[in-house]
Amino acid sequence: MNILMKSIAISALLIISSASAQNLFPILGGQRAGTSVFTFLNIGVSARAVGMGESVVALNQDASSIFYNPAIIAQLENTEVSVSQIQWPAEINYDYFSITHRLFGRNYIGFNGGILHMEPMLETTEYHPEGTGNYFRFQDRFFGVTYGAKMTDRFSFGMTIKHVAEDMAGHHMSAFLLDMGTFYWTGYRSLRFCASLSNFGQQVSPEGTYEKRILDQN
């Protein structure tokens, strides 16, 4: 009986190990597919904000603040313009701009946008690791419109509707996303309570076609 139980246990372990081994050797080119999109929206657009760990939801600094909290727009009385460029390794660049303006009374409007782009990259595959001779482009971009208003001298709210798109090697995907924020000044020195919800929107999937090749693993 003990021998039978041991045999069953060993067989079960072998089956589990075989199933796990298949996950250790995924099909080449398919690793970590579909994990996340539009991750460029996590890139900071202000040197000051990045230096503070991007804990700037309550910081009414300049026009770039609407990227972190749309409600800040109602705290900027004058017309503000912010422009930045970030140069990453491998010739990757991120350009950003934002502008805010007081419409009338306690109503404010702003625009912002960013584009992550790179030089054409040589296409490589499992069969041609040194390159196929073809080149492809990659680009992420967004453009947003922000509206904010002062409800009282201490409380304001704001929202941003933005269109986000990605193009990579002939594949395209896009979506509309929403940012919302609130700003409340307590009246005690610089103590503020703020909240911000960023990049809330629909599910996104790429458009286009692709060719799937499975290598012989034997």
Where would I find each of the regions flagged by the language model?
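Short strand-turn segments of transmembrane beta-barrel domains in outer membranes
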Residues: 54-57, 79-89
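Outer-membrane beta-barrel porins/channels
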Residues: 22-50, 59, 86, 93-218
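Hydrophobic h-region of N-terminal signal peptides that target proteins for export
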Residues: 12-21
